[in-house]
Curated annotation (Swiss-Prot):
Chief localization: cytoplasm
Function text: May be involved in the regulation of spermatogenesis and sperm maturation.
Positions annotated as LRR repeat: 28-49, 51-72, 74-95, 97-118, 122-144, 145-167, 168-189, 194-215
Presence of keyword Repeat: yes
InterPro entries referenced in this protein's UniProt entry, alphabetically: Leu-rich_rpt, Leu-rich_rpt_typical-subtyp, LRR_dom_sf, LRR_domain-containing, LRR_R13L4/SHOC2-like
Organism: Rattus norvegicus (Rat)
GO biological process terms, semicolon-separated: intracellular signal transduction
Record protein name field: Leucine-rich repeat-containing protein 18
Lineage top rank: taxon: Eukaryota
Alphabetically ordered keywords of this record: Cytoplasm, Leucine-rich repeat, Repeat
GO CC, any one term: cytoplasm
Lipoprotein listed as a keyword: no
Length: 256
């Protein structure tokens, strides 16, 4: 802590510095990488680079994200993990091109998540792990394109059934929350393994071609089951960044 109780000044990011931090990803996207630079205040100069596709401000000391972040209308990928953020701005709902949002390892509470998050209709991945959420934001239930959700290492005691009904949800991490029943998180994750429709009929009620298709599907399912490894299950959310408070490079330590 600096003299007088003030937070230490972080590295000053100028427009030229930011321009030099723009990288081209393997798929041709423009990524502005300002991670691990000791930044304490959101650098407003980067708003002039609103043509970028991806923004990485992770592993800094940022406390507040300004409303003006919505100027990044083309942004598809936003990584803010491992900062000191306790609230997201309402304007984040205007960033409708977002596909990926990582705000893990911050100081977010449920009240710090604006209802405007439900406007992110295209978002596929949201990581809210390692925060202070005591309930699941109801806004998540409106995000029908969600494939992956991280809620691990929070203060959750229950998960709304509506989350498991998200039509495209494939991966959910709710580990290390204070659920009343120790196995509740596993039971909830298992509920995502859904069947669109299930009908019980007898063989005599099926035509020969339908019966053949059912038998083929059954054989395929049995084959998949026989190939399943008997070893302990691996991380169901290991591809999302969720570092600890010291922002270590190795994410293996945080796999679940």
């Amino acid at each position: 802590m600096a003299k007088g109780g003030k937070s230490p000044k972080g590295k000053k990011i100028t427009l030229n510095v930011a321009k030099n931090c723009i990288k081209i990803t393997f798929d041709g996207r423009k990524r502005l990488d300002l991670s691990k630079m000791g930044i304490t205040t959101f650098p407003k100069c980067i708003l002039r680079l609103n043509e970028i596709d991806e923004l990485d401000l992770s592993r800094n000391m940022i406390r507040k994200i300004p409303d003006s972040i919505s100027k990044f209308q083309n942004l598809r990928w936003l990584d803010l993990h491992s900062n000191y953020i306790d609230k997201l701005p309402e304007s984040i709902g205007q960033m409708t091109s977002l596909l990926f949002l990582n705000v893990s390892n911050n100081r977010l509470t449920t009240n710090g998540l604006p209802v405007e998050l439900n406007q992110l209709k295209n978002i596929r991945t949201v990581n809210l792990g390692l925060n202070h959420l005591d309930s699941v934001p109801t806004t998540l239930g409106a995000l029908k394109e969600l494939h992956e959700v991280g809620l691990h290492d929070n203060l959750l005691t229950s998960i709304p059934a509506g989350i498991s009904k998200l039509p495209k949800l494939k991966k959910l991490n709710v580990k290390r929350n204070p659920f009343p029943k120790p196995d509740e998180s596993d039971m909830f994750v298992d509920s995502i393994k859904r069947l669109e429709n299930l009908y019980l009929v007898e063989e005599k009620d099926l035509c020969s071609s339908c019966l053949q298709k059912c038998q083929q599907a059954r054989d395929k399912l049995n084959k998949i089951r026989s190939m399943a490894p008997s070893a302990p299950r691996k991380a169901i959310f290991s591809n999302l960044v969720s570092p600890n408070s010291t922002a270590k490079e190795s994410q293996e330590e945080w796999s679940v």
